Every structure is written in C-alpha cells, then in structure tokens.
Amino acid sequence: FDKAVNLIFDMHNEYGFKAMKETGQSNSTFVKGLKQLFGERVAIFSLDPQSTRARGVQPDHEVYISYDQVTVDDVATLQDELKLNPTAVESAYLVYAIYKDRWLLTLLAQEGPDVEEFAKEIGAHPGSLVALHRKLKRLENFPFMVQKGHADGDVVDRIMEYLDRGINVVLEFGQQTSMLCYLLVANIIS
C-alpha cells in the first residue's frame, strides 16, 4: 500500500488542500486536495504561508531558504533565466572562493559603486560582477529567502524526514509564481 511517496511542486496551489473546480461555471465550487483525501499521509509545505492561510489552510511547515543554501551551481543553472553571461558566473565562483557559504550575502550586501570596488578586490571583471549583483538582487524580493537558517532547520532535511517516514509532501508556491522562483527552489531542494 505505502510503497512510494511523492514530492509535489505545486506552483498553482492545486494539490495541497483544495482547488477550484475547472468548470465553465462562475460559482466557486472546490475539489478536495491531497491533504483532505489522505490526511496525515500528506504534509503541506508553503513558500508563501500568508497565501496558504488566506485560502483557509494551515501549512504543516513554512519554507524558508537561507542565502547560504544557494550555491554558485544553483546560480549557474539559472544562467538562462537570469540572462547571465558566462563571465558573470565565473565572477560568482570568484566570490565563493573567498567567502564560501556567505558568498551570496556578501555580494548582495554591496551597494552602488562598492560593487565595482569589490570586483577589483577579488579579481573579477567589474562589469560582470555588477551585472551578477543586479540580477541576483531579485532574490531579495522572495519572502522565503532569509539571511540565516530558520528555527525549523534546513528545509531540505525536513522534507527528506517526511519522505523517509512515508509522508507525501506538497510544496505550495502561493503567490510566488515566477519561473526564477520555481527553478531556484527546485535546484536547492533537488
């Protein structure tokens, strides 16, 4: 019976608790989600707990990702989405070589002309680092991004604990529907 578990990336909030029926009718009829159907065998993790609660659902876990969980390889896989040139990714590796897990926080903490000065200090091309900085600043708009780890611990570890216990996980994105958000979270979790 319980031979497999699922990790569902629910970008449109359709699988967790309930979803609007896909009929042409204007009435707001809902269909049950996995949590209503399978109860404790499903856990809802939310990147946007405010949105989840606004739909009348209490998430099992709120998802927070700290900047130190984002690797340069995660950014490299986002190269097309962020429209980064290869030298910008190389610049990220230069920042990482010096600052390790704090590379992203250190980079994003730079402001204005400080970014060019920072580039010179680490031996990166100033234009590349400025472009990388500008494009990665978008991550600061994601409410689930935090400077330090959250009290619940590492979200990847928490999801794996649930899956190991045979509990299916629905990861709701709430209002966070950009492709950048989806790809970033998928990279970090997988």
Positions of predicted regions on the chain:
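P-loop NTPase motor domains
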Residues: 2-8, 12-190
